Amino acid sequence: MLVTGLEILRKARAEGYGVGAFNTNNMEFTQAILEAAEEMKSPVILALSEGAMKYGGRALTRMVVALAQEARVPVAVHLDHGSSYESVLKALREGFTSVMIDKSHEDFETNVRETKRVVEAAHAVGVTVEAELGRLAGIEEHVAVDEKDALLTNPEEARIFMERTGADYLAVAIGTSHGAYKGKGRPFIDHPRLARIAKLVPAPLVLHGASAVPQELVERFRAAGGEIGEASGIHPEDIKKAISLGIAKINTDTDLRLAFTALVRETLGKNPKEFDPRKYLGPAREAVKEVVKSRMELFGSVGRA
């Protein structure tokens, strides 16, 4: 069933579990995510980026919305990292039930203004909104920000931001980063900062860049001929602790891509004469489903539908 993001996430934060937001780019990813959700009886969020929407066009967005409507568990269709008001309006027209406006690279006042504009438009049609807030290193309005605080969310600013914008859930910058880590040192979550934010912001909180990047997946990808540098993700125990502190939505993309691509490579490597797409996309779809199921177990969303 198709529901708003807030319907899923408000319950998750109140009851202390997390819900996965899994990025999809095609039919196989969408099917894998929804099949996993139904098998695990878990709510889920299908996330589409602007890049995915450009790649698949209206055929993709209509398919994702239609499959979400048919699902036997609560599903939100979410715009991931919407860069503009126009991008959000496009998602609203396509039937999305959750949208993100990401103006975190702008100054605080611009972020507030642009986010509030999106909130007003989305709420007018019953759609809920995710916003993002971070800090840049340097000095702004006589406030010095140390390098260790660069890009990290300021708890008091988060409270003010949510009060002024009316956003429904907030993506916080607490140390994670998008994609697989390559030469950036061990990824981390600033749990004390998260705890301070959660005390001031009662809304559901969102963790981006939360893929685990399991070494077995990395090695399987390499063994099948893939090339990837040193890569690591967020430790499962760090994710669990973050959920206990108020994180309700956890984004995952890299792990799904690794699993899917590794299986396609493996299948074609073992069967070089194969040219039936179903024979290599099918196993890849199953690999994605298994990753999604394991993430749902980690997040504690199993049986919560």
Swiss-Prot record:
Chain residues that bind dihydroxyacetone phosphate: 179, 209-211, 251-254
SUPFAM superfamilies per record: Aldolase
Binding annotation for Zn(2+) 1: 81, 178, 208
Gene3D superfamilies hit by this protein: Aldolase class I
Role: Catalyzes the aldol condensation of dihydroxyacetone phosphate (DHAP or glycerone-phosphate) with glyceraldehyde 3-phosphate (G3P) to form fructose 1,6-bisphosphate (FBP) in gluconeogenesis and the reverse reaction in glycolysis.
Quaternary structure and partners: Homotetramer.
Protein name as annotated: Fructose-bisphosphate aldolase
Species in which this protein is naturally found: Thermus caldophilus
Phylogenetic lineage: Bacteria, Thermotogati, Deinococcota, Deinococci, Thermales
